[in-house]
Swiss-Prot record:
<dbReference type="GO" id="GO:1990904">
    <property type="term" value="C:ribonucleoprotein complex"/>
</dbReference>
<dbReference type="InterPro" id="IPR027486">
    <property type="entry name" value="Ribosomal_uS10_dom"/>
</dbReference>
<dbReference type="GO" id="GO:0005840">
    <property type="term" value="C:ribosome"/>
</dbReference>
<keyword id="KW-0687">Ribonucleoprotein</keyword>
<dbReference type="InterPro" id="IPR001848">
    <property type="entry name" value="Ribosomal_uS10"/>
</dbReference>
<comment type="subunit">
    <text>Part of the 30S ribosomal subunit.</text>
</comment>
<protein>
    <recommendedName>
        <fullName>Small ribosomal subunit protein uS10</fullName>
    </recommendedName>
</protein>
<comment type="function">
    <text>Involved in the binding of tRNA to the ribosomes.</text>
</comment>
<keyword id="KW-0689">Ribosomal protein</keyword>
<dbReference type="Pfam" id="PF00338">
    <property type="entry name" value="Ribosomal_S10"/>
</dbReference>
<dbReference type="GO" id="GO:0003735">
    <property type="term" value="F:structural constituent of ribosome"/>
</dbReference>
<dbReference type="InterPro" id="IPR036838">
    <property type="entry name" value="Ribosomal_uS10_dom_sf"/>
</dbReference>
<comment type="similarity">
    <text>Belongs to the universal ribosomal protein uS10 family.</text>
</comment>
<dbReference type="InterPro" id="IPR018268">
    <property type="entry name" value="Ribosomal_uS10_CS"/>
</dbReference>
<dbReference type="GO" id="GO:0006412">
    <property type="term" value="P:translation"/>
</dbReference>
<dbReference type="GO" id="GO:0000049">
    <property type="term" value="F:tRNA binding"/>
</dbReference>
Length: 102
């Protein structure tokens, strides 16, 4: 697999779970002999929702909720077949979304 890179994008609502997952991926890749670039933190996406507190009166009384989506990018340079097998068998936390591009 010479000259090929694996790009892994991770997304999660909780940054602590995201950081532990990136540490697991980095340690697994380094253990199998691959070179890792990252983790690179991407900008956090913040979605805000504003709703009325009461159903029909007091328009000025509102409440805001937000969802923060934290993101990280990892590049694995020149992965070995053992690296790919180890990454496929890796079990990450339930709240982490993983996108892998070859």
């Amino acid at each position: 697999m010479n000259g090929q890179n694996i790009r892994i994008r991770l997304k999660a609502f909780d940054h602590r779970i995201l950081d532990t997952s990136t540490k697991e991926i980095v340690s697994t890749a380094k253990r199998t002999g691959a070179q890792v670039r990252g983790p690179i933190p991407l900008p956090t996406k913040i979605e805000k929702f504003t709703v009325n507190r009461s159903p029909h009166v007091d328009k000025k009384s509102r409440e805001q909720f937000e969802i923060r989506t934290h993101k990280r990018v990892l590049d694995i340079v020149d992965p070995t077949p053992q690296t790919v097998d180890a990454l496929m068998k890796l079990d990450l936390a339930a709240g982490v979304d993983v996108e892998i591009k070859l």
